[in-house]
């Protein structure tokens, strides 16, 4: 039977609950326990798929095609465990399910209420993750901050959860902030005390407190916090600001987080094997020469909009003994100032996914610059579509070529709507989503990088390469290096005469891990390293 851990947050938002949950997952796995982590998000959207990246950040896509919160990316990268649509729950999806049941008559004419119907549905979702994953421990992160009206049904549900399982089958972790007041030279505990008081008023007594701080928390302060909050001193876990999120698991291990949780859950504290993770963190803190990578995007004002892309670049640099010097470049600025003004001196260019017309011409200009200057280039999803548009306009003489998404009446729709999308009306959850196979062309650069005949990648798109232009594309010197098994869908393209010019319709960033960088990102960094002074004469072979 699974054990359950609930992670709540107090004092301020964005306190780091997701990293704490992911770190605990990593520590439990290092002791041989299997883990699944889910996120309860208190917004009324059914999922984040139609939300603006400026408001929500990246949409992370799971293997089974769920559009989820970016925290699921942290869960997967830290635990190296694939999550599913069951691991992402929103208030909107809960209410949708309950209302659908009411319409079907499932409640036999009863009055449908927040308690017990909404809270019962929330509890059922948590149990469903446990039964489907067969995990030893299910960790649940509750979004929002204790005290928010939106979070109350979730907090009530996890309070009720005690009645579903035994006392030693669940643990409550509360993540708080200890602010430092410079004029008094003190870390203040009162906000944490009030946050725990609020949690207790709901009926939840935390077992462990994780206290965020920018400086050391001494033993006296831990005793004070424990005394006022009803938590043993050893269960007050300091979490100091770290230079990397990947350093957090080891910090929390040293402070005894996993030991305390296992004690509450009455589980054996097996020996932990964190050696590989420690080596990764050591390499991060002792990197090699920097590679300058330009990320040309539409939403660069909010870095979280491209979180998995940035992490994939970091993983690749880690594997290549390089440090990442990332330059955020607004695609619209390229339209105003020109590509060379903003990209000169870069060792590589990445154009990630996105939607809509804004900034597309800037992305196309950046791709042309990378092609003509022979700078390593990687395009992702819309980035591949922009690479095809750039080819059509500048090499095939189709000056008005574009995507049917951007200009439905274009005379040269080199990118067009997937046939199965023709009759789709709703926006949410209706794209080509999740894992699909891709057959790699023998002898291609992709073949060298992947080393597999068929790979499985995650997708999120409605539009595709228009096969009416396939022959013209191939005659221009480009190569289709990856396609659907039936050959119908173009998944991966490359330019053989270029040092590294490749673009894919899928999202490889979602499969990159700290110890297992995605082959396309590693290939990009390998190629970028060849531009550095004193670079080796040959690109290192991909492991």
Swiss-Prot record:
Domain Glutamine amidotransferase type-1: 292-534
Gene3D superfamilies hit by this protein: 3.40.50.880, P-loop containing nucleotide triphosphate hydrolases
Segments of this protein annotated with the region Amidoligase domain: 1-267
GO cellular component: cytosol
GO biological process: one example: 'de novo' CTP biosynthetic process
Assigned keywords, A-Z: ATP-binding, Glutamine amidotransferase, Ligase, Magnesium, Metal-binding, Nucleotide-binding, Pyrimidine biosynthesis
E.C. number: 6.3.4.2
Binding-site residues for ATP, renumbered to this chain: 14-19, 71
Matches recorded under SUPFAM superfamilies: Class I glutamine amidotransferase-like, P-loop containing nucleoside triphosphate hydrolases
CDD domains reported in the protein's UniProt record: CTPS_N, GATase1_CTP_Synthase
Lineage: superkingdom: Bacteria
Catalytic site positions: 381 (nucleophile), 507, 509
Subunit structure, interactors included: Homotetramer.
Family named by the database record: Belongs to the CTP synthase family.
Other observations noted: CTPSs have evolved a hybrid strategy for distinguishing between UTP and CTP. The overlapping regions of the product feedback inhibitory and substrate sites recognize a common feature in both compounds, the triphosphate moiety. To differentiate isosteric substrate and product pyrimidine rings, an additional pocket far from the expected kinase/ligase catalytic site, specifically recognizes the cytosine and ribose portions of the product inhibitor.
Entry protein name: CTP synthase
Origin species: Synechococcus sp. (strain WH7803)
Phylogenetic placement of the source organism: Bacteria, Bacillati, Cyanobacteriota, Cyanophyceae, Synechococcales
Gene name for this UniProt entry: pyrG
